[in-house]
Design a protein with these regions (language model features):
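Aromatic-rich peripheral "rim/lid" segments of glycoside hydrolase catalytic domains that contact
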Residues: 25-31, 37, 304-325, 329-417
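N-terminal carbohydrate-binding/catalytic regions of secreted carbohydrate-active enzymes
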Residues: 29, 34-110, 119, 130-137
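Acidic-and-aromatic substrate-binding clefts and catalytic sites of carbohydrate-active enzymes
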Residues: 54-56, 77-89, 115-117, 130-133, ...
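Noncatalytic carbohydrate-binding groove/subsite architecture in carbohydrate-active enzymes
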Residues: 130, 161, 167-293, 299, ...
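Conserved, mostly hydrophobic/aromatic
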Residues: 76, 154, 228, 293-295, ...
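Substrate-binding cleft of extracellular glycoside hydrolase catalytic domains
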Residues: 24-26, 88-195
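Alpha-helical scaffolding within the catalytic cores
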Residues: 25-29, 63, 88, 135-142, ...
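Bacterial N-terminal signal peptides
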Residues: 7-16
Length: 417
């Protein structure tokens, strides 16, 4: 009798284990998401005013997420944990999943990392870290365990190692410390085993350019992360390297549109070259793992550097071309591109409404889709959807001729305007 009971117990235990495995086998993991064109990525911030003092509400975030879902975005990237926005994002996704079990949205959760004295009146100490970093990491752990079905990736830092971030950058050993900490928590089953850990940073920080970044600590970091999340911004780089942007002399007889289109293809190729530089360095140290594009984008307005008085790079047509080209390339190569970004955010340069940082969105703050998404409106993709309670319309009232009044041909390369 005891033997019979024991056999029944073993069979029941086996059944339970198989059931649990079946449930786990249905889990969508970072490994399944990244590099999969079915899971398009986007950088998200939902702030609607020129300050972050007013957080987007759960209802407002739900509006945003429905818009994102309409254009097939299924994973969003966030940046920090010291604002209520991320909590509202997670609550909004949870509510939308309850309302519609087929709704899919996942999160690459950003934990902000600073050096000691960052954003203070004291000189930054880049080799030491802010006490706030430990709080960010702990909060990331807590939220990931609370929302494991939503949070699939933790990113330690945002452009936290690149040396032009002079007010806050840290040395790679600080990022490595926290990546190793999170990886150890996974081993201890204190974080989901399928959670992926990375850091999101400029291509330079990942070894894709200047040799000053090629350090032993960087090599250890590359080995420690589950994948590399690199950033590339041709529109920023052309400000410092003007030879990469503009019209070549042998293109002088092209139409204005063809001159612009050709320049945008070169901008895409420049971004690809930075991506390839990161891959090349990674492989040179004997590592082979996924490299995704954690950020790239193109601003549509600027009063100084990239506008009419500058390089003539910022407008909706060029931004639309860049978006299209980068999506086509990344999808073909099966590389996840977290495009920057979905909505304009005017808090980034709150005292300068026409500052370029405010206008990277595919939508402006007047609930209008920019030129990159006009075709989605034509197809009725946003029908019934709202932002701030108002329907989504086109910029320029949908008048392409009016749009072209703001599109200028870039300068000739190696020539004065």
């Amino acid at each position: 009798m005891k033997k019979f009971v024991y056999i029944v117990f073993i069979l029941l235990l086996s059944f339970v284990n198989k059931s649990l495995f079946a449930q786990n086998s249905n889990e969508v993991t970072a490994k399944m998401i990244l590099g999969n064109p079915k899971y398009q990525g986007m950088c998200y911030g939902g702030y609607r005013t020129n300050t972050r003092d007013k957080e987007p509400t759960v209802s407002e975030v739900k509006e945003d997420l429905k818009i994102l879902a309409a254009i097939n975005i299924k994973i969003i990237r966030t940046y920090n944990l010291h604002h209520e926005e991320i909590l509202n994002v997670l609550k909004a996704i949870t509510e939308l999943k309850k309302e519609n079990p087929k709704f899919e949205m996942y999160v690459m959760l950003g934990a902000w990392i600073d050096c000691k004295n960052a954003w203070t009146e004291f000189p930054p100490i880049h080799e030491e870290e802010s006490q706030r970093n430990a709080i960010e990491i702990q909060k990331a752990v807590e939220l990931t365990n609370q929302y494991p079905e939503i949070i699939k990736i933790i990113s330690v830092g945002n452009e936290a190692m690149v040396k032009w971030a002079t007010s806050y950058y840290v040395t790679p050993d600080i990022i490595l410390k926290w990546v190793n900490h999170l990886q150890e928590l996974k081993k201890q089953e204190k974080l989901p085993k399928n959670l992926w850990i990375t850091s999101s940073d400029n291509y330079l920080s990942w070894g894709g350019g200047d040799a000053q970044y090629h350090t032993e600590d960087l090599n250890k970091l590359i080995e420690a992360v589950d994948f590399i999340s690199m950033h590339t911004y041709p529109i920023h780089d052309e400000r410092f390297f003007p030879e990469i942007w503009g019209v070549k002399e042998n293109e002088a007889n092209l139409s204005d549109k063809m001159k612009i289109d050709t320049a945008m293809v070169r901008a895409r190729d420049y971004a690809i070259s930075q991506y390839n530089g990161v891959v090349k360095y990674m492989k040179s140290i004997g590592v082979n793992k996924p490299v995704e594009m954690g950020e790239t984008g193109w601003t549509t307005i600027d009063a100084i550097y990239y506008g009419v008085e500058g390089s003539k790079a910022a407008d909706e047509y060029k931004a639309a071309q860049y978006y299209k080209l980068m999506r086509e390339w990344s999808n073909k190569q099966k590389i996840t591109c977290f495009y920057f970004e979905v909505f304009d955010e005017n808090w980034k340069d709150g005292s300068n409404p026409n500052g370029y940082e405010n206008h990277f969105g595919l939508f402006n703050l007047q609930n209008q889709a920019k030129f990159a998404l006009w075709d989605k409106i034509d197809k009725g993709i946003f029908k019934g959807l709202t932002r701030n309670g108002k329907p989504i319309t086109k910029t320029y009232d949908g008048n392409e001729k009016a749009l072209w009044q703001d599109v200028k041909v870039p300068r000739f390369i190696n020539k004065q305007n």
